Amino acid sequence: MKSNKEINVAIVGASGLVGQKFIQILQERKFPIKNLFLFASEKSAGDKIIFNGNEYVIDKLEDNSFQKNKIDLALFSAGATISKKFAPIASCTGCIVIDNSSAWRMDKTVPLIIPEVNPKDILSHKGIIANPNCSTIQALVALKPLHDVFKIKRVVISTYQAVSGAGNQGIKDLENGAKNIEQKKFRYPIFNNCIPQIDTFNDFGYTKEELKLVNETQKIFHENIKVTATAVRIPVKNCHSEAINVEFENSFDMGNIIAVLE
């Protein structure tokens, strides 16, 4: 698709925190949209959103939504279950799907893309393109230029993730905690607290969030780099942070590192 050609675009999960950010960025960057279609669950159907000064109504996502509306590009952020069901339906109509969930990230037939890191991998797509976990993106954008020069041997990543990573309800829980209102999203109190668990634990003591960092890093770099990770939820609305310890195969000094990152 050429950037100056207007296309039909769909947002799946338009009522969610990420879906709303999709809409904001499309508007800010003046993306060449011919027709915009907003989809979400039945609960959000009928809600209205303003885009480029026009009012759009959110529709319930249906099996025929993509074929009926001749959608060229669909941005999915409605969770893995929805993506697993509807992304193949959309791609079969000729629509290109960019999926923000974990549904397709580790599928061998689906490229996992960070534009600043592995853009050429997108050429292998068959209709579905996955983007990594937010913390993976944050880490690898910084690590890629270092890996190219010094070759990474081992990485230890500690992430400190804002409640926005848990969606609108995560933000509400933080705000409600200050008012002593019972929270709904987090198992433990998040107000004035750090929770050293994001998602469920496996038998080895890693959470799903931590394993995403391990597996996605190896897939994107196409190498079996040793990675270990810790993920902590912290009581701030936005902005994740990370502390990364890296072991390289090639020799270096700090001046080399700074020069590469600059």
Residue ranges, per PLM feature:
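N-terminal Rossmann-like NAD(P) cofactor-binding subdomain of oxidoreductases
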Residues: 1-190, 226, 254-255, 259
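Charged docking surfaces used in two-component/phosphorelay signaling
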Residues: 74, 163-262
